Amino acid sequence: MELVCSSSGVSKQRNTFKLTEPFRSARLIYRAAEPEELEDQKFLTKIQQEPLSYQNANVRLSKPQSSKSGKDYLKFVAEEALIGVIICLPASEEGASHTPIGIIHLDKLAPHITHHRFAEIGLEITTAYQGQGYGSEAIRWVLQFAFLTAGLHRVEIRAVGYNPGAARLYERLGFQREGLIRERLWFGGEWWDEVQLGMLENDWRALQEQETK
């Protein structure tokens, strides 16, 4: 069974978000992050300790990350985000474990502002699996979750100026460039801009209709 949706409320298209498999996409599986699981602790620490992934995914001071940092990040993803999942490649054979390759989450609003119904995407893909379209696939999946399941009206994402390819990717996925904060970030001995992008529920539904024509 697949969930049928349209911007008018009339069933005009069939979305790929399957009710029977809501935590899968074409090539990926999205599983819960487990704060008490040693393997998840190791994986999140590994992501935090990859300099390129770390610098592109957040604007904190770049420095060696401890295992505690990985555990804290895992706890945030599992317990404090609106949704936070580990992105995995399916196991190649029955009984084997899925291969974790990244993490994606929607930040949760504080209780007194939830009526605004927006969230920001956080995404990290391990260096070995970058450049293969997994990040794009995961973003498309989390947008479906945001608008079809969580009932959000708006989803936001940011891109750092020293990673210009990220902003171009987000725009290809349908995000609109909404703001530029000039020279907000200090990195590599230079000042860099931060790009703010957003997508509304109606934007997303229009994209779904275009893809089904």
Show the residue positions of the predicted features.
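Conserved acetyl-CoA-binding loop-helix of GNAT-fold acetyltransferases
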Residues: 124, 131-148, 164-172
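GNAT-family acyltransferases
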Residues: 1-128, 191-192, 196-213
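Short, solvent-exposed loop/turn elements at beta->coil junctions and helix N-caps
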Residues: 107, 181-185
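Conserved beta-strand-loop-alpha-helix junction that forms the acyl-donor binding cleft
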Residues: 126, 157-167, 184-187
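Conserved GNAT acetyl-CoA-binding A-motif
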Residues: 148-158
